[in-house]
C-alpha cells in the first residue's frame, strides 16, 4: 500500500495503561505523530468502531495477558472482519495470545504486532527495584511510531 493510502486510513488505538503508564506513553506519542484516535478502555467500555479502517489494541502484559479492560472491550465492541494491529509493553515478555483468541472469534486480520520493554515493579520485581527501568525509551517510542506509520 502506498504511503498516501496509509495516511487516509482511519485508525483508532484502544489501550489500557495501568501501573507505570508505559503503554500510554507509547500510544500518546503515536497519536501526536500519526492520525490515530485514542480510546482508553479503562475509562470507556463502549465505542462504535465501525467507521475505522484499522483498529489497534495496546496494553501492558499482566500475568501473560492483555489487560482485562482490553479483552472485554474487544469482545464487546470489535466488529467482525476488521483489520487490527497489536501493541504491548512488558517487563517479562510479549504475549498476544489472550487478545488473539478474541480476534479469531471476530475473524479479524492482524496486520502487525509491536512490543517493547516497559518498566515493571509488579510482584517479585518490586523487591529488586523493578525491571526494564527507563523503558519505553525514545528509541522504543520511535520504533512504535514507525510501526504504525507503516501499517
Give short role names for the model-derived ranges.
Residues 1-8:
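Short, Lys/Arg-enriched N-terminal segments with co-localized hydrophobic residues
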Residues 11-12, 18, 24, 32-37, ...:
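FMN-binding flavodoxin-like domain, especially the glycine-rich phosphate-binding loop
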Residues 35-46:
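A short beta-strand-loop structural module common to alpha/beta enzyme folds
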Amino acid at each position: 500500500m502506498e504511503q498516501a493510502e496509509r495516511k487516509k486510513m482511519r485508525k483508532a488505538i484502544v489501550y489500557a495503561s495501568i501501573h507505570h503508564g508505559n503503554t500510554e506513553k507509547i500510544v500518546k506519542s503515536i497519536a501526536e505523530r500519526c492520525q490515530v484516535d485514542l480510546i482508553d478502555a479503562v475509562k470507556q467500555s463502549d465505542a462504535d468502531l465501525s467507521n475505522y479502517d484499522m483498529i489497534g489494541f495496546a496494553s501492558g502484559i499482566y500475568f501473560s495477558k492483555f489487560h482485562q479492560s482490553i479483552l472485554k472491550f474487544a469482545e464487546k465492541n470489535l466488529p467482525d472482519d476488521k483489520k487490527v494491529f497489536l501493541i504491548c509493553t512488558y517487563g517479562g515478555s510479549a504475549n498476544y495470545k489472550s487478545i488473539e483468541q478474541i480476534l479469531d472469534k471476530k475473524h479479524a486480520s492482524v496486520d502487525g504486532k509491536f512490543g517493547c520493554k516497559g518498566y515493571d515493579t509488579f510482584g517479585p520485581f518490586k523487591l529488586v527495584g523493578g525491571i526494564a527501568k527507563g523503558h519505553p525509551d525514545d528509541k522504543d517510542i520511535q520504533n512504535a511510531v514507525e510501526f504504525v506509520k507503516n501499517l
